Regions:
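Short hydrophobic alpha-helical segments that form membrane-spanning helices or hydrophobic packing faces
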Residues: 131-138
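An N-terminal alpha-helical hairpin/helix-loop-helix interaction module that forms a charged
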Residues: 1-123, 141-230
Length: 230
C-alpha cells in the first residue's frame, strides 16, 4: 500500500491549520486531554465537556446528528470514562499496534459506544463509527477518524470492499500495514508537525501522532476522490 503522493497531500492540508482554522480544533482538544490529569478533567468538568463538544461541533459531528439535541452535560459520562484510563493510552500509536494495544483500542471503542450511542442510532454503523473515531482521535490521537472522506480513501487504497464503517481488528491491521508501507514519510511529518497552543497561538512541542498524519492523508485523498466523481 505504498503511496507516492503523501507529502503533496499533507502539505496541502497543513496550509489550512492556522490557530483560528477549523482543522486546528483537533490541536486544542488533543492538547487538553493529553496534558491534563484525570483529577483536572473531573474538577473542571464543564470545561472538559466544552473542549470535547466544540471539537466535535467544529468537525461537523452536530450536523444531522442526535448530538444537535444535546447540551454539553451529555458529554459528562465520556469525560468520567476518559478520566478512569491510565496515561498509557496516550502512548498508543500506529507504530505500536501490538495485540495488547489493539485490544485496548477496541475496548475503549466498545465502551464509548455503549455510553453515548442511542439505541435508535445503532442501526447506522457508519455514523456511529465516525463519531466514536473522531472522539478517539481528538482525545488520544491513536486512530484516524473514520469519516466519509477517510472511508472513501482507504476503500480505494486498500481495495477492501467492506470499507471502514466500524473499528475492528481487520481495519486496524490495514491501517498498520499502510503505516509500515509508508513509514518514512509518515514518521517525518509526525516529527515536524506540532500542535498549536490555544493561549499563545504558537506551536507547542507536542507532535502530531502518526495516526493523525494518516487521518490527514486519508481525508485529503477522499476529498479529491469525491471531487473527481462529481
Amino acid at each position: 500500500m505504498k503511496q507516492e503522493n503523501i507529502k503533496e497531500y499533507l502539505y496541502y492540508y497543513l496550509l489550512e491549520t492556522n490557530p483560528t482554522d477549523r482543522y486546528t480544533s483537533f490541536d486544542y482538544c488533543y492538547n487538553y486531554f493529553k496534558n491534563n490529569s484525570s483529577e483536572y478533567l473531573l474538577n473542571n468538568m464543564e470545561k472538559s465537556c466544552l473542549v470535547l463538544g466544540f471539537y466535535l461541533a467544529s468537525w461537523g459531528m452536530l450536523r444531522n446528528s442526535f448530538l444537535l439535541q444535546k447540551s454539553i452535560k451529555f458529554y459528562e459520562p465520556i469525560i468520567k470514562y476518559i478520566a478512569e484510563l491510565d496515561r498509557s493510552y496516550w502512548s498508543i500509536d500506529v507504530d505500536n499496534y501490538t495485540d495488547d494495544n489493539i485490544n485496548k483500542i477496541l475496548k475503549v471503542y466498545e465502551d464509548l459506544e455503549s455510553k453515548i450511542i442511542p439505541i435508535n442510532e445503532k442501526g447506522n454503523p457508519a455514523e456511529a463509527g465516525t463519531l466514536l473515531t473522531k472522539i478517539l482521535l481528538g482525545v488520544f490521537g491513536f486512530i484516524p477518524a473514520f469519516d466519509t472522506n477517510f472511508l472513501k480513501a482507504f476503500k480505494f487504497i486498500s481495495k477492501y470492499n467492506k470499507g471502514f464503517k466500524v473499528v475492528n481488528l481487520n481495519n486496524l491491521k490495514i491501517i498498520s500495514e499502510f503505516y509500515v508501507s509508508n513509514k518514512i514519510v509518515i514518521d517525518e511529518f509526525a516529527s515536524i508537525t506540532k500542535t498549536y497552543d490555544f493561549s499563545t497561538g504558537n506551536k507547542t512541542n507536542i507532535s502530531y501522532t502518526k495516526a493523525k498524519i494518516i487521518d490527514m492523508y486519508g481525508f485529503m485523498v477522499g476529498l479529491k476522490l469525491k471531487k473527481v466523481k462529481s
